Amino acid sequence: MGYTVKTVAERTNLSPNTLRYYEKEGLLPSIKRTKSGIRHYSDEDLEWLGLICCLKNTGMSIKQIRDFVDLSLQGSATLKARCEMLVDHKRSVEKHIEQMNLHLEKVTHKIEFFTKQYEDFTS
């Protein structure tokens, strides 16, 4: 089944311009077009787009995602390299989560501090 840019944009909450940009950057290399040039996305393209969004939303750069896509296009010979790339990215995400948890603890502590200050002030 084929999906138009508009349909994919609605399903993914990405703008049509973002979808075109991802294609231009080589992140979606298998998008088919009609004879008149209209893009048609397949279910497999939507799966790829889901992975691309996941990687981007967790801090992977467009260049790194393109490198991952390029490796994927080379087939099974690059499975190990792709796995290593994702393991490295996972470590980076975990480190970021640790840092964010430290910030969250500090904010929580300040909320508790100011709540107590306010309660003492108003009683």
Regions found by a protein language model. Give the residues of each.
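Flexible coil/turn residues that form the inter-helical turn or adjacent wing/linker of helix-turn-helix
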Residues: 1, 15, 58
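Conserved active-site tyrosine of GNAT-family acetyltransferases
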Residues: 22, 41
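Glycine-centered, phosphate/nucleic-acid-interacting loop/turn motifs that mediate DNA/RNA or nucleotide
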Residues: 26
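Short glycine/proline-centered loop/turn elements that form peptide/ligand docking sites
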Residues: 8, 15-18, 35
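Arg/Lys-rich, alpha-helical DNA-contact motif
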Residues: 4-10, 29-32, 43-123
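Short, basic, alpha-helical segments at the C-terminal edge of helix-turn-helix-like DNA-binding modules
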Residues: 37-39
